[in-house]
Amino acid sequence: MSGFYHKHFLKLLDFTPAELNSLLQLAAKLKADKKSGKEEAKLTGKNIALIFEKDSTRTRCSFEVAAYDQGARVTYLGPSGSQIGHKESIKDTARVLGRMYDGIQYRGYGQEIVETLAEYAGVPVWNGLTNEFHPTQLLADLLTMQEHLPGKTFNEMTLVYAGDARNNMGNSMLEAAALTGLDLRLVAPKACWPEAALVTECRALAQQNGGDITLTEDVAKGVEGADFIYTDVWVSMGEAKEKWAERIALLRDYQVNSKMMQLTGNPEVKFLHCLPAFHDDQTTLGKKMAEEFGLHGGMEVTDEVFESAASIVFDQAENRMHTIKAVMVATLSKLNN
């Protein structure tokens, strides 16, 4: 793990393929050690600040449990719990927290915010999610894929992302494919494709590493032979209702359902989702979607697929914690470098 100590974790393309692989190996080891009761605390005495301008169940719990497992202490600063960007500049917040904490996690809005924190904090800063990138999620996804196809390398795997690919998940998936050599296929309407410049950059790197990146509107062509089909939510609670109708009309044909799974021609294909998922009407937003748009069987994924044996979404959710732990240990512990 040489070279990680005191580094930031802001986006995947900041690292080499070898460095990404070493993080995944460390995560697998930490997971095995925890399961076997052999985990050693390497962060005893460390203090960690968790800045959440956007709430999250999985990210917060993953960072807190990972920190506690490793002997660290955390301070949670929620959407109303800090003055970042309001009464105090990001630059000043970074310099204050950097004097008190050994590491800082940020989950919120623009990538420039986490970049500024990293520039001025003087301690490792980790991106828990920004509008542009979600690197900790992709670490968990890659570990989950390795676990479910242990006999294959990444450049022997085909990952399909169906739906809205112009978001942080689409961008981080491109970066992951660039570093691992995955065969990545973004199956989405053209209006939902990522920025062309990032696609071009990541495709060139993916091809150098034995993979490829394809963008297509053709569902049948895009999912053929897939090992994994991935999707994410189409709408967020904070968005205007007018956008809901527009987004649903645009993406309805890209819902992950039993037909799409069958179109892969792979009876062992697995389903991935970063969660939360609107697969039924048991949530406030899910109920609204069902009532207003007739999406009673699920939105971006049907309940049938979500609850099927092909679904490995809760393995992904667990692996958020193990991979986040690996990032913290690699960047904060001299014992691991």
Curated annotation (Swiss-Prot):
EC number: 2.1.3.3
HAMAP family, per database record: OTCase (MF_01109)
One of the GO biological process terms: L-arginine biosynthetic process
Name by which UniProt lists this protein: Ornithine carbamoyltransferase
GO cellular-component term (any): cytoplasm
Pfam family, one: OTCace_N
GO molecular function, a single term: amino acid binding
Catalytic reactions of this protein: carbamoyl phosphate + L-ornithine = L-citrulline + phosphate + H(+)
Cross-referenced InterPro entries: Asp/Orn_carbamoyltranf_P-bd, Asp/Orn_carbamoylTrfase, Asp/Orn_carbamoylTrfase_sf, Asp_carbamoyltransf_Asp/Orn-bd, Orn/put_carbamltrans, OTCase_ArgI
Function field: Reversibly catalyzes the transfer of the carbamoyl group from carbamoyl phosphate (CP) to the N(epsilon) atom of ornithine (ORN) to produce L-citrulline.
Sorted UniProt keywords: Amino-acid biosynthesis, Arginine biosynthesis, Cytoplasm, Transferase
Family to which the UniProt record says this protein belongs: Belongs to the aspartate/ornithine carbamoyltransferase superfamily. OTCase family.
PROSITE patterns in the record: CARBAMOYLTRANSFERASE (PS00097)
S-S bridge residues: none
Compartments where found: Cytoplasm
